[in-house]
């Protein structure tokens, strides 16, 4: 919210709220840059000008291989939610689809999180022809990861998973002194106060975390909309006693001593971090 004060740097204030206007404009202005930067770096060239698949996602690209030969590559995948990445090649000679074979180096990258193969760039150098398909499989294991200070997180492949806390949305029309009177110039681009509308104070049941499985929802649509997430992970939890909202505004540090509300084990669904707004990502732990 606009009055959050749990950030050690200037104690948060509007820095911790969902709003289009920020005290320092470069923060809001830079926040969205990761996506076009990711897309711009998905496909690179090696020294010969041949294709390098550096970052994965559904895409198509055309490379000029010289001497009138071009190759169109269709990348077919649901990465980062699924393990398989397929590349389908179509070659053209002087603008017409080619039935001939063509020598080409195709380089792909194994991400550092993938333990099934040596990370880094690998090259497949051979004769290719139209219709060839090259498949990269990146096994994604569900991992329980220690957070830097305290608590544990759930990660699968490149994605960290969070509990999407039920949320009350309230428009924030207050004009804050630290913003020097700045307000959004677009009435449809509003400032929001988000507060919990349901239970959030959960601890992972540590000795029940083996054998976690991903649940595929079959949803289509934008995968980072909460209603459309393609994958979920169901985890065992217990409610934590006396872990409450400090000043009714934000989640405090994890409790050093976790006292369960009861012996009852509940199950909650975690979704990709990027599909949440108000979230619990780092959990305290408790025994069954």
Protein language model features and the residues they cover:
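C-terminal beta-rich recognition modules with glycine/proline-rich loops and embedded aromatic residues
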Residues: 1-82, 88, 97-98, 137-288
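Beta-strand-rich binding/interaction modules
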Residues: 89, 100-119
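Surface-exposed coil/turn segments at beta-strand junctions on protein surfaces, enriched
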Residues: 80, 99-101, 127-129
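A surface-exposed beta-strand-loop module
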Residues: 116-133, 139-148
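Short, well-structured beta-strand segments within conserved domains
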Residues: 85-88, 104-108, 129-138
